A protein has these predicted regions:
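Short, surface-exposed linear segments at secondary-structure transitions and domain or protein termini
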Residues: 35-41, 58-61, 79-87, 143, ...
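Short hydrophobic/aromatic-rich beta-strand segments that constitute the beta-sheet cores
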Residues: 17, 37-41, 59-63, 71, ...
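Short amphipathic beta-strand/extended segments with alternating polar/hydrophobic composition
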Residues: 27-33, 50-55, 69-76, 158-160, ...
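Flexible, processing/modification-adjacent segments and terminal tails
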Residues: 1-2, 6-12, 56-129, 149-150, ...
Length: 206
């Protein structure tokens, strides 16, 4: 999973893009500093956001109030950002850091050979109890995600529609996030995440 985690994607230190919903674009910026990843989005002429800290192999979300970082309330982790289909746990991809990951098979996504992995939520926070991800066999890039609740009902699907090469690695450029009516195949909303290829800079890692 190391190759598809945000720490690897952000080796340049910064990634810019936007969240698009119903034709409205909201600027988005991701920054890496040590083991802290900052997510910022621009609304009403103001930048706001949250942090994800990598601690002992776990990814924990924090919000900043009056200059002090405090842990996310469990319910907030699964809340939507700026009325989109993207939640805080979706944007952070924190499930990629869950320790209970297992390869359960192989599949074809957009005619590309992929490994299918199952990840189980080690806690009770967030909306997902179980997540399946599909990783490109050749490039090691994330191709698709499906998130399920504790009752096994499908809640979300992420479809990666475009990749970009960063430091000779294939990583996320465009992704669609679909919300489903729980337990059905009915899509109730869709939001697009799009990132720009970072300009060349000094290579940075975790």
């Amino acid at each position: 999973l190391e190759g598809i985690r945000l720490g690897t994607t952000l080796q340049h230190g910064k990634l810019d893009g936007h969240i698009r919903k119903d034709g409205k674009r909201t600027p988005l910026s991701l920054h890496l500093k040590g083991e802290d990843i900052t997510f910022q989005f621009h609304t009403n002429n103001t930048w706001s956001g949250f942090h994800m800290q990598l601690q002992e192999g776990e990814a924990k979300l924090y919000e900043t109030e009056q200059g002090k970082a405090t842990p996310f309330p469990p319910k907030k982790i699964g809340e939507a950002i700026i009325n989109s289909d993207v939640t805080y746990e979706d944007l952070s991809l924190r499930f990629l850091y869950w320790k209970d990951a297992e390869v359960v098979g192989e599949d074809k996504i957009k005619m590309q050979s992929c490994y299918k992995l199952r990840l189980r939520n080690p806690g009770k926070d967030g909306r997902y109890a179980l997540v399946y991800i599909w990783v490109h066999k050749k490039y090691g890039a994330l191709m698709q995600v499906a998130g399920y609740d504790v009752q096994g009902r499908l809640l979300k699907r992420f479809h990666v529609t475009d990749l970009m090469t960063v430091d000779k690695m294939q990583t996320l450029k465009k992704m669609n996030v679909e919300t489903y009516e729980a337990g059905t195949n009915k899509v109730t909303g869709i939001t697009y995440l799009e990132f720009k290829k970072p300009s060349k800079a000094k290579r940075r890692g975790l």
